[in-house]
A protein has these predicted regions:
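Rossmann-fold NAD(P)-binding glycine/threonine-rich loop
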Residues: 79, 84, 92-112
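NAD(P)-binding Rossmann-fold cofactor-contacting core
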Residues: 22-43
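Extreme N-terminal starter segment of soluble prokaryotic enzymes
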Residues: 1-4
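Active-site-lining helix/loop region of Rossmann-like oxidoreductase modules
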Residues: 6, 119-265
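N-terminal Rossmann-like NAD(P) cofactor-binding module of classical short-chain dehydrogenase/reductase
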Residues: 65-67
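Rossmann-fold dehydrogenase core element
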Residues: 101-120, 135-139
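N-terminal Rossmann-fold NAD(P) dinucleotide-binding loop
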Residues: 12-13
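Short acidic low-complexity segments
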Residues: 48-61
Length: 265
């Protein structure tokens, strides 16, 4: 099968390289990026580099499309691919919140919208718990100041993250609000809400913590199954916002698409 990759940042590059090295059950013949000049050295390092084209070109030449380009591109990718019966793997999960129209479009054309676990763990447990009923769900994200710089919520509220000397709560609300205020930082909260009790009932807290150098996510859920709690400390990549686990999760997710033995809910 041919995988089209839109976005050649940390995630896109990792997936393309894995395919080039024969680690995936996909070939990548086409990719798109807003900054082709920034990926020339990367493409030259590959044995079989994908052809750079635009969104339409990627969709036309691929069986499945992987979005790694930011929430602002998700709708356009879905509307181009889903009517052709082509499934879309979405990393910018926040862009799918309250987009029942895109889910309906996929259903109409017998395509799928797929969400890798990304930088979070425990989604299998949440999905299982949700089948029986979850009474409450909370998520707390701690990030070092560089990871939060430039976020719309930080800019609009004139929050000086560099001035903080201790862990400080800078946001409390729902995943829906969090993804609008921190579109490049907390896509994990959208994934957690999809797996659990939804974006309106899930409680979200974001903390700026100058004492850490990792992105830390903690999730707690309570229901008839009992109580679950999980925590992950992600090592950031060079762009500070994306954890290494995010691209590793994408690679494993793609492997699972043709795996004989599949583990997890």
């Amino acid at each position: 099968m041919d995988l089209g990759v839109i976005g050649l940042g940390v995630i896109g590059k990792a997936v393309v390289r894995a395919a080039d090295e024969g680690e995936l059950p996909f070939t990548v013949s086409a990719a798109a990026t807003r900054t082709p000049g920034n990926v020339r050295d990367f493409l030259n390092s590959l044995k079989n580099a994908p052809r750079l084209t635009d969104l339409a070109g990627v969709v036309a030449s691929s069986d499945v499309i992987l979005e790694a380009s930011g929430g602002h591109t998700v709708e356009a990718i879905c509307r181009a691919a889903l009517p052709l019966g082509k499934s879309v793997i979405v990393n910018s999960v926040g862009a799918l919140l309250e987009r029942e129209d895109l889910i309906a479009l996929a259903e109409k054309h017998k395509a799928r919208i797929m969400i890798p676990s990304g930088a979070i763990i425990g989604l299998d447990g949440l999905k299982g718990a949700a089948a029986g009923g979850i009474a409450s769900g909370t998520m707390t994200t701690r990030k070092p100041p560089p990871s939060l710089k430039g976020a719309p919520f930080v800019e609009e509220n004139n929050i000086d993250v560099d001035a903080m000397t201790e862990a400080t709560v800078i946001f409390e609300g729902s995943p829906l609000e969090a993804c609008k205020g921190f579109p490049a930082n907390v896509n994990v909260s959208a994934a957690v809400s999809f797996a659990g009790i939804g974006p309106h009932r899930t409680e979200m807290r974001i903390m700026c913590d100058p004492t850490i150098n990792r992105n830390i996510h903690e999730v707690e859920a309570v229901g008839e199954f009992g109580r679950l709690f999980f925590r992950i400390e992600n090592v950031p990549t060079e762009n500070h916002r994306t954890g290494i686990l995010t691209y590793l999760s994408n690679i494993q997710f793609l492997r699972q698409q043709t795996a004989t033995l599949v583990v997890g809910t």
